[in-house]
């Protein structure tokens, strides 16, 4: 899947200047932040909770660990990891978008999750953390919005401890023709109408559908992780490959 030229990239199906994409993506998430959780439940029929639960179980977080929830948005994974790592552990919820970060902070504080979570506005391509710092990094439904995915994956490798684990949960490519046809119909005909009804913003959800189609498929993303230096890379398809969880280790 082409990422464009050195100076250009994809914003959905559009080709844009690479330096413009971050601002354009920011505009999408500023627009949808307040209704993001509601839309996740509606557009996935609640199944996103099952995908995230599998990701958390696969992470194997234990008391005392340091976890980075990258592109953590409204904090679904952070909330679970906070309980798993306990008082001696630390979870960092990082997101490039300050609107999403604000929603996540308020949501977790309303739940009483305050002691072992910190919040950082950060670009995945240049993470502001020391080398060999985290035991686990997760990025759920965020990588496809990153301009330079290869740089982001290398940045994640740098801040992982030796023996650390990266988990990428992302929309991917359905494995069967029937599912692909149903998924296309849903994504391009129904999803934007849902976005218009719930958030008064059909255009942002058109972008989200297009960004999923432009994201590297399962094997391509696996290869990108291997090229960055991750080892024992594997992926698990869920819901016929509509979503895939990629996992790799730093040794």
UniProtKB/Swiss-Prot annotation:
<dbReference type="GO" id="GO:0008425">
    <property type="term" value="F:2-methoxy-6-polyprenyl-1,4-benzoquinol methyltransferase activity"/>
</dbReference>
<dbReference type="GO" id="GO:0009060">
    <property type="term" value="P:aerobic respiration"/>
</dbReference>
<feature type="binding site">
    <location>
        <position position="74"/>
    </location>
    <ligand>
        <name>S-adenosyl-L-methionine</name>
    </ligand>
</feature>
<comment type="function">
    <text>Methyltransferase required for the conversion of demethylmenaquinol (DMKH2) to menaquinol (MKH2) and the conversion of 2-polyprenyl-6-methoxy-1,4-benzoquinol (DDMQH2) to 2-polyprenyl-3-methyl-6-methoxy-1,4-benzoquinol (DMQH2).</text>
</comment>
<protein>
    <recommendedName>
        <fullName>Ubiquinone/menaquinone biosynthesis C-methyltransferase UbiE</fullName>
        <ecNumber>2.1.1.163</ecNumber>
        <ecNumber>2.1.1.201</ecNumber>
    </recommendedName>
</protein>
<feature type="binding site">
    <location>
        <position position="95"/>
    </location>
    <ligand>
        <name>S-adenosyl-L-methionine</name>
    </ligand>
</feature>
<dbReference type="Pfam" id="PF01209">
    <property type="entry name" value="Ubie_methyltran"/>
</dbReference>
<keyword id="KW-0808">Transferase</keyword>
<keyword id="KW-0489">Methyltransferase</keyword>
<dbReference type="InterPro" id="IPR029063">
    <property type="entry name" value="SAM-dependent_MTases_sf"/>
</dbReference>
<dbReference type="GO" id="GO:0032259">
    <property type="term" value="P:methylation"/>
</dbReference>
<comment type="similarity">
    <text>Belongs to the class I-like SAM-binding methyltransferase superfamily. MenG/UbiE family.</text>
</comment>
<comment type="pathway">
    <text>Cofactor biosynthesis; ubiquinone biosynthesis.</text>
</comment>
<keyword id="KW-0474">Menaquinone biosynthesis</keyword>
<feature type="binding site">
    <location>
        <begin position="123"/>
        <end position="124"/>
    </location>
    <ligand>
        <name>S-adenosyl-L-methionine</name>
    </ligand>
</feature>
<dbReference type="InterPro" id="IPR004033">
    <property type="entry name" value="UbiE/COQ5_MeTrFase"/>
</dbReference>
<comment type="pathway">
    <text>Quinol/quinone metabolism; menaquinone biosynthesis; menaquinol from 1,4-dihydroxy-2-naphthoate: step 2/2.</text>
</comment>
<dbReference type="InterPro" id="IPR023576">
    <property type="entry name" value="UbiE/COQ5_MeTrFase_CS"/>
</dbReference>
<keyword id="KW-0949">S-adenosyl-L-methionine</keyword>
<dbReference type="GO" id="GO:0043770">
    <property type="term" value="F:demethylmenaquinone methyltransferase activity"/>
</dbReference>
<dbReference type="GO" id="GO:0009234">
    <property type="term" value="P:menaquinone biosynthetic process"/>
</dbReference>
<keyword id="KW-0831">Ubiquinone biosynthesis</keyword>
